[in-house]
Amino acid sequence: MVERTQIINAVTAAITQAPERKFQESIDITINLKHVDMAQPKNRIDETILLPQAIGVKKIAVLGKGDIVSQARNAGVDLIIGPDEIERLGGVPREARKMAGQYDFFLAETAVMPLVGRWLGQRLGPRGKMPQPIPPTQDITPIVERLRNSVKIRSKDRLNMSVKVGNTGMTVEEVSENIDAVVKRVVGRLESGELNIRSVYVKTTMGPAVKVM
């Protein structure tokens, strides 16, 4: 497994080599795989990872009616969509696509999942954003709190994937801790573990890519 010092050195280099900007830049990593058959769906990476260091609040939408709506309001979610609105959005593809792009995570009570699949599945599914089903008695507050500080990493059918792990307003150690968490999670999903990792790079929005491993 990659040593933390390697990660710290790479993050430091990525930040120092980047052109100076007057705005805060994102810091992303790209993980390149090898010897993985991505034609097999079981080998594809699709993980939601809770980061040890927060990188900015994620936007969360809740779909449903009744008790989950009051829970969603109390949890401070960014958007609540009722059954009628689900159906309406399904008839306005452009608006549905915009909504799918604006929000990071979706939760839906189990009762409306068939509606979601019918009307919004084409917009959410390809983005890996189909809602997490919520049973009637489940408290969504801890789920919302966890997702606020989580990222989603997906390979689809490719041998590479990228994800945001921080920003230039964070310390090198904080960003490095997040990178460590993401890499370990991906390695844990691979059949041959670290042997399936070709390389990992880190970069700021406008800066050059620096090799981590």
UniProtKB/Swiss-Prot annotation:
Pfam families: Ribosomal_L1. GO terms for molecular function: rRNA binding; structural constituent of ribosome; tRNA binding. The keyword rRNA-binding applies. One of its GO terms (biological process) is regulation of translation. PROSITE patterns: RIBOSOMAL_L1. Keywords: Repressor, Ribonucleoprotein, Ribosomal protein, RNA-binding, rRNA-binding, Translation regulation, tRNA-binding. One of its GO terms (cellular component) is large ribosomal subunit. Part of the 50S ribosomal subunit. Binds directly to 23S rRNA. Probably involved in E site tRNA release. Protein L1 is also a translational repressor protein, it controls the translation of its operon by binding to its mRNA. Belongs to the universal ribosomal protein uL1 family. This is Large ribosomal subunit protein uL1. The gene is rpl1.
